[in-house]
C-alpha cells in the first residue's frame, strides 16, 4: 500500500469526521483539503462515498440506546411511534427533491461562488437565529410536533445547494422554527441516519463502476478514522451546545466562505476537477 495515499486517506478521514456533523460544510472542506493533498479523480470520488458510512455508523453508535429503544417500542410505545413518524416525515422532502433535482443542482450550482455564498449566507442566518428573541416550541426531540419535523425536513432540502451543509441546514432550520439548541442538534443527528444512508446507497449505485477492490486498504483507513473522529465530534458538540451558542460556527462559516472565494480567485484550488 502506498504510504502517501494512506496518509491522504487518514487526513481526509479526520476532516470528514470533524466536519460532517458540524454546521460548516464537510463537502467544502474535503474539496479544499483533497486538492491541497493532490487527492482527486475517481478514487477520491469513491473514497468520499465510503467514508460517509463511517460518519453514519458513528452517530448511530453514539445514539444506539435511543435507536434501540425506538425500534423495540415501535409496536406499543406512543413516544417511539411519534418520534419515528416525525423522523420519516422530515426525511421525505429530501428524498423527493433529491431525486428530482440533485443532478441538475450538481451540474449548475457546484462552483466556488455558490459554495462560498451558501457558507456565508448560512453563517449570517445562524447568527440571526441565535440572537433573535423567540419562544422555544420544543425543548427536546420528544416535544416536536409533526409540523415542526416537516419544517426541518424542508430546511434539509437546502443542503442540496453545495456549501450549505446538511447539518447546517437542519440545525439552523430547527433554531429558526423554535427548537432549542439541544433539540435542533439531536434531531439533526437522528435525521442524518436515514438521509445519509439513502444518499450513500444512491451514490454507491451511481458510481459503482469506479469502486475497485484494490482501493480497499485506503477506504478502510478513511472509514476507521472518520468513525473515530466523528464519534468524538458528536459527543463534543452535544457538550458544547449545552452552554454555548452556534455563533462560533457561524463566524467560521463566513470566514471559510471567504477562503473559498480566495482559493478560486487566486487559482489555488482546481475547482474544475472537484467533485461534490
From Swiss-Prot:
Bacitracin is thought to be involved in the inhibition of peptidoglycan synthesis by sequestering undecaprenyl diphosphate, thereby reducing the pool of lipid carrier available. It is a multi-pass membrane protein. Keywords: Antibiotic resistance, Cell inner membrane, Cell membrane, Cell shape, Cell wall biogenesis/degradation, Hydrolase, Membrane, Peptidoglycan synthesis, Transmembrane, Transmembrane helix. Its EC number is 3.6.1.27. It catalyses: di-trans,octa-cis-undecaprenyl diphosphate + H2O = di-trans,octa-cis-undecaprenyl phosphate + phosphate + H(+). It is an enzyme of class 3 (hydrolase). GO terms for cellular component: plasma membrane. Belongs to the UppP family. The gene is uppP. InterPro entries: UppP. One of its GO terms (molecular function) is undecaprenyl-diphosphatase activity. One of its GO terms (biological process) is cell wall organization. Its main location: membrane. This is Undecaprenyl-diphosphatase. Catalyzes the dephosphorylation of undecaprenyl diphosphate (UPP). Confers resistance to bacitracin. It comes from the Bacteria. It is found in: Cell inner membrane. It comes from Ectopseudomonas mendocina (strain ymp). The chain crosses the membrane at residues 12-34, 43-63, 85-105, 108-128, 185-205, 218-238, 249-269.
Amino acid at each position: 500500500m502506498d504510504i502517501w495515499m494512506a496518509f491522504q486517506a487518514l487526513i481526509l478521514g479526520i476532516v470528514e469526521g470533524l466536519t460532517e456533523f458540524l454546521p460548516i460544510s464537510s463537502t467544502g472542506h474535503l474539496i479544499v483539503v483533497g486538492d491541497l493533498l493532490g487527492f482527486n479523480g475517481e478514487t477520491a470520488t469513491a473514497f468520499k462515498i465510503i467514508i460517509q458510512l463511517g460518519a453514519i455508523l458513528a452517530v448511530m453508535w453514539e445514539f444506539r440506546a435511543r435507536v434501540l429503544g425506538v425500534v423495540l417500542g415501535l409496536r406499543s410505545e406512543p413516544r417511539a411511534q411519534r418520534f419515528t413518524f416525525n423522523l420519516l416525515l422530515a426525511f421525505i422532502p429530501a428524498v423527493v427533491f433529491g431525486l428530482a433535482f440533485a443532478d441538475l443542482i450538481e451540474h449548475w450550482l457546484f462552483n466556488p461562488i455558490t459554495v462560498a455564498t451558501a457558507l456565508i449566507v448560512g453563517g449570517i442566518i445562524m447568527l440571526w437565529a441565535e440572537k433573535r428573541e423567540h419562544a422555544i416550541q420544543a425543548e427536546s426531540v420528544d416535544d416536536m410536533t409533526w409540523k415542526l419535523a416537516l419544517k426541518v425536513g424542508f430546511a434539509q432540502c437546502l443542503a442540496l445547494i453545495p456549501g450549505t451543509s446538511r447539518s447546517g441546514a437542519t440545525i439552523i432550520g430547527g433554531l429558526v422554527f423554535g427548537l432549542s439548541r439541544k433539540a435542533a442538534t439531536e434531531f439533526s443527528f437522528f435525521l442524518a441516519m436515514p438521509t445519509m444512508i439513502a444518499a450513500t446507497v444512491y451514490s454507491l449505485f451511481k458510481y459503482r463502476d469506479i469502486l475497485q477492490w484494490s482501493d480497499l486498504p485506503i477506504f478502510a483507513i478513511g472509514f476507521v478514522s472518520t468513525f473515530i473522529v466523528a464519534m468524538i465530534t458528536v459527543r463534543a458538540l452535544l457538550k458544547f451546545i449545552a452552554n454555548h451558542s452556534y455563533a462560533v460556527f457561524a463566524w467560521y462559516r463566513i470566514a471559510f466562505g471567504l477562503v473559498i472565494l480566495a482559493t478560486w480567485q487566486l487559482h489555488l484550488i482546481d475547482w474544475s476537477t472537484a467533485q461534490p
